[in-house]
Amino acid sequence: MDYVGGSLKLKNVKKKPLKKKKKDSKKLAEKVQEHSSRDKSPLEENGVSTYQMLRSKDTDSAMPMTEAQKHFESVQEQRLLQKAKNERLKTHKDRIDEYNRLLESQSEHFDMPKIGPG
């Protein structure tokens, strides 16, 4: 018995090649530019991002922050900036070396000793 790989072949049905539609890059670029210019609010044009606007709306409606909460927010922001700075300075080789060290430190599931009878 011969086995033929692939999809099921039907008799008297001719396969039509699929044609991909090509997008016009000029029209697409115009639409993107038009959309981005239309969506900008006056605050975004002044340098305030959408994230900052949403964040300020959330804090205005909530109770005022305590000193501890303010300190926590500032420390969290500093750590995030420091982490981003460190990641930016790493080369691809550094990232690969770090990943390999992580994998070496982990034990594989089949290296674990068997526990109990069996």
Swiss-Prot record:
Record field: compositional bias (Basic and acidic residues): 26-43
GO cellular component: nucleolus; nucleus
Region called Disordered, residue ranges: 1-49
Ranges of biased composition (kind: Basic residues): 11-25
Matching Pfam families: FAM32A (PF08555)
Superkingdom of origin organism: Eukaryota
Name this protein carries in UniProt: Uncharacterized protein C31G5.21
Organism this protein belongs to: Schizosaccharomyces pombe (strain 972 / ATCC 24843)
Upper classification of the organism: Eukaryota, Fungi, Dikarya, Ascomycota, Taphrinomycotina
